[in-house]
């Protein structure tokens, strides 16, 4: 009887769960019109922590938006940023590569566009600017690293099956954000020597970093349940690695935000 009363009391005390709200945000960088998407739970009162999501090289597709929604369901204000331009989404590797190279060819511009995305999150009026982070997938993982190298306001950056641009010597002692990366041992897009160099350069830069490498046949796009639809052998979903990386990410945000 005591247990029943306790459970009933808890149920009565639980607030009505609000639905995640969403808003389209239009902005511009270097003549390119960009369209991002903001997600938040309006049951949350006051300015809280915010997380920017950077898409993979396919563009700002439903997968990136889904991750932003998942963050909102966890109580974060999330912004799915656009790094390519309004409507630039594809499932064709050649087109994806073209758009990606257009952005990454100018590293300063690449960093500026990422910072502008974070600025949209801050300008939402829903976020405490001292409690922001960013996550990114594939190309987006490389993008959040560029944010770290350029002195981002984000307290933490997290990358999944990311390209791994090494920290330049000029940022030694200047990386003020926590860097966390999740990588698959079976990812043939990133050579072992690239991984080693990436780790060494972060260490030389005196960065606060952590890298989780999932062993076995964990490949690129291990977080994406639809990875196989692209028909690329190196893209493969791994439910265990997906769940583990997401859980560790949420733990990190509880610690840093």
PLM feature spans:
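Short alpha-helix in the alpha/beta-hydrolase fold that links the catalytic acid
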Residues: 67, 191-201, 211
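C-terminal catalytic histidine-bearing segment of alpha/beta-hydrolase fold enzymes
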Residues: 203, 208-257
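Acidic catalytic loop of the alpha/beta-hydrolase fold
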Residues: 186-190
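Short, proline-enriched alpha-helix->beta-strand connector loops that line the catalytic pocket
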Residues: 174-179, 205-208
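N-terminal signal peptide c-region/cleavage motif recognized by signal peptidases
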Residues: 13-17
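Serine-hydrolase catalytic machinery in alpha/beta-hydrolase-like enzymes
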Residues: 24-123, 223-236
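Primarily recognizes the serine-hydrolase "nucleophile elbow" in alpha/beta-hydrolase
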Residues: 114-175
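Short beta-strand/loop motif that positions the catalytic acidic residue
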Residues: 181-183
């Amino acid at each position: 009887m005591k247990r029943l009363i306790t459970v009933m009391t808890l149920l009565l005390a639980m607030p009505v769960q609000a639905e995640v709200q969403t808003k389209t945000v239009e902005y511009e960088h270097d003549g390119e019109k960009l369209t991002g998407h903001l997600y938040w739970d309006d049951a949350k009162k006051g300015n809280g922590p915010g997380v920017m999501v950077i898409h993979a090289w396919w563009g700002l597709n439903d997968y990136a938006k889904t991750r932003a929604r998942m963050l909102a369901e966890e109580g974060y204000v999330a912004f799915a940023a656009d790094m390519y331009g309004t409507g630039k989404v594809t499932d064709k590797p050649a087109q994806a590569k073209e758009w990606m190279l257009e952005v990454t060819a100018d590293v300063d511009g690449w960093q500026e566009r990422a910072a502008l995305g974070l600025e949209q999150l801050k300008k939402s009026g829903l976020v405490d600017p001292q409690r922001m982070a960013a996550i990114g997938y594939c190309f987006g993982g490389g993008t959040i690293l560029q944010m770290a190298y350029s002195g981002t306001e984000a307290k933490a950056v997290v990358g999944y099956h990311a390209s791994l641009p090494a920290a330049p010597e000029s940022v030694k002692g200047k990386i003020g954000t926590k860097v966390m990366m999740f990588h698959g041992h079976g990812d043939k897009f990133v050579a072992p020597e690239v991984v080693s160099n990436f780790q060494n350069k972060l260490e030389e830069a005196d960065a606060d970093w952590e890298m989780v490498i999932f062993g076995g046949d964990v490949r690129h796009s291990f977080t994406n349940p639809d990875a196989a639809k692209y028909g690329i052998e190196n893209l493969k979903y791994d439910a265990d690695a997906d769940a583990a990386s997401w859980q560790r990410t949420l733990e990190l945000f509880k610690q840093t935000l």
